């Protein structure tokens, strides 16, 4: 079957002389250390872990009792190294939890909730807890 193409278009010169013989390099920083802002919209959260704590992927690490807030969970398993102010998008300093990956894949996800047996309050609490 003949492939469909468009007539015309823009065909700028490639100009890849500088890079055509270079190998591809990973320029992104290692994910062995992550910095997770404790507030990601809504009311500010407070850390519920401390420096030196071991955390699992999916574990809640910050929360707030305020109406408009969502808890924050760890994206990696590892050890909490720092809890400090760090710049985020817009060069605004926010409280962050710094976690060093320990190489394990420990998880701490919630067990599924049975919709046939849970109450409305249990379901709402679970949704809020999940962030």
Regions from the language model: what does each represent?
Residues 1-131:
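Well-ordered secondary-structure scaffolds
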